[in-house]
Amino acid sequence: MAGTFVSVLDISGDSVVTGPVPVEPFVPGSANLFPKMTSRINDTAWELWEFEGFSAGGEAAVGVSLYRDARGVDKGGFHAEVNAIWPDGRKWGQTLYFAESIVTAEGASPDEGRIHGFWRSNSNTAGGAPAAARSITFSISEDLGVATVCFSVPDQVTGTIELRSSGSNRKSCLPATEEAALLYPSVYYMFPMGPVDANADLTFSFSATAGGEIEEERKLSVQSRGGGHGGMVRGWSTEAWPQFMNDAYYVVAKVGSYMLQMLRVVGSAAAGHRPYAVARLYLNKELVCAANQAVDAQSAAEGSTATTQPRDMVAVEKVLSEPKSQEQVVSGAFSDKNIGYVIEFISGQQKRWRFDARHKRAWWSEPTSAPGPGCTGKSGWIEGFLGGSDGETFEGAGVGGQLQIPVP
């Protein structure tokens, strides 16, 4: 019998605590969209729902990451990171905070049926006077075919993002085993909708100062009929990111007939500085490589793995500019000045696909350490791509982001 399941977190209550909290188990063959920490979340844990779309050549792009974690406690809300870029290079980026995070599921169990998420402000201010309604909401259909994100944040952003799964076999997008959903032990990271077509119709407000008078409103549009694509991420863990990694690269891109989605991290000293990844490659909307094992370039070249059983793998290497090169390049704003990445997918049958990503346009940037020669941060780019299998050279574009954390 169908029912409605509800998970409510209120930043002003006792929803964020210190110490262990109950965590619902991973469900094989499911998108696991309903929260895993349903009534409370501890101060190291996090849950993520992410949506993004970009135009055919990456001229315009938008992304939103909705979090449940402790990072916004001192700001009075669970945070949402929203970023947009226009063809002329204009950018908009804000971290928004919402006192309440509510997720509901309509189905026979929390992991079946339609999902609705609400990040919203409280209906009253501390003094009891009505407050302006602010919210970001999302709905995901039962078959994972459509996700709609609605923005209603007056004087900042309004409008919608719509993602439509374009994969011919949606079941193949879902991890059949817990291992297939793991980025790192106890860290889950999934692309449950697979390749998607994207539409976005949004209006952003610009002001000279935070909370100041609106000086300009600007519309942003991404259309699937014009080649708009994107991705959707679901992740969660009881482990804070700095506990297991110090470097990460995320990308979603459309390159010719290929669609690729990936998060690769480099482990911290506590994790042995090993690489870890969740990577998916689609050809003509069919999944051809599902890698949960990251290897270095030498292992990729040799086709060797740490196990005897053939497995899909991915290798990721940074590209640095030649010291005396006159080439115009784009890099991050921090100490890591890489200009792109080489991504190689290797199937268990040793089929290979290589993609060269170069940072095409800088998008967003934020420090994660104090300024200085070794400063770290996170940077986002519109990425240009070349690649495919042996003998193929497709062009494409996507969105990518790098994160470095100042831990050993």
UniProtKB/Swiss-Prot annotation:
Pathway: Mycotoxin biosynthesis
EC number from the UniProt entry: 5.5.1.-
Group of enzyme by EC: isomerase
Superkingdom assignment: Eukaryota
Pfam families, sorted: DA_C, DA_N
One Gene Ontology term of the molecular function aspect: isomerase activity
Keywords annotated in UniProt: Isomerase
Primary role: Diels-Alderase; part of the gene cluster that mediates the biosynthesis of pyrrolocin, a bright yellow trans-fused decalin-containing tetramic acid with antimicrobial activity. The PKS module of prlS together with the enoylreductase prlC catalyze the formation of the polyketide unit which is then conjugated to L-serine by the condensation domain of the prlS NRPS module. Diels-Alderase gNR600 is involved in endo-selective Diels-Alder cycloaddition to form the decalin ring. Subsequent methylation is carried leads to pyrrolocin A.
Protein family (similarity comment): Belongs to the Diels-Alderase family.
Protein name (database record): Diels-Alderase gNR600
Organism expressing this protein natively: Fungal sp. (strain NRRL 50135)
Highest classification ranks of the organism: Eukaryota, Fungi
